[in-house]
Amino acid sequence: GFCLVGSEMCIRDSNMSMEITRFSPAVGAEIRGVDLSRGLTGEEFKEVHKAFLDHQVLFFREQKEIPPEVHVEIGKRFGNLHFHPAAPQMEGHPEIFVIHTHRDSKIANGEFWHSDVSCDEEPPLGTMLQLHLLPPVGGDTLFSNMYQAYEELSETFQKFCDGLSALHESEHVYRGRYSDRGVDDAGKVYPSSVHPVVRTHPETGRKALYVNRAFTTRIQELSEDESRAVLDLLLDHCEQLSFQTRFRWQKNDVVLWDNRCVQHHALWDYWPEERKGRRVTIAGDRPY
């Protein structure tokens, strides 16, 4: 059932003490009292799924390491799994993307604001990441609420953006990106797609801005100069501090985020230290 603790909302299950607490005014909730390494019961999944739609990003604290097959199984509760167009897969578990940054890395995953693989025709709906190895300090992940970004535009500008579509490209992001992890991408064609600038969330019906600094390169209906000006304005707007929260990881924390209404940015401020974990990505549908 539900209970209120002060001004915070918690949800308690009769068989366990799952507790859901708002993480920041803009976005996110922290969840305690559920052991993801054992998977989710039907009742637990229902509570987690509701919280996912209500809060956009879920932070699961005090976790054990999730076995890869359980990680995959939890991801599949939300839908089919998405296969990354560029990154190396985990041996024996092709659905798992291993995140690993160390002293010799040329790049780090997600070190700019983005929504995961928005260049795909059907971009992923969500991502579930667990980190097992962390730097002593640094390596935080920031999240920004794209519902709020849309809602805080003037009504006139909302209407203008409602009629626009944008090109999302990935060649400049992925080409050669994973060469230090044994990926030879010679001859590979990386995806690009056109999506609405404002997308409607298929489960909540709410509108969210859907342009990001990593993948979005051009607004289709505008001239090049107009496109650059409008895109720069929107990207700066999306990155406002008041739409954001910042998560400091502890070992084995798990974060589940909704790519349809949230952008994120993984800070690479910990070189030469190491950061490592595993993620599954849940397939989504074509934005509208």
Sequence positions of predicted segments:
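Non-heme Fe(II) oxygenase catalytic core, chiefly the N-lobe of the double-stranded beta-helix
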Residues: N15-V254, N259-Y288
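Single conserved hydrophobic/aromatic residue that forms the stacking wall/gate
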Residues: G1-D13
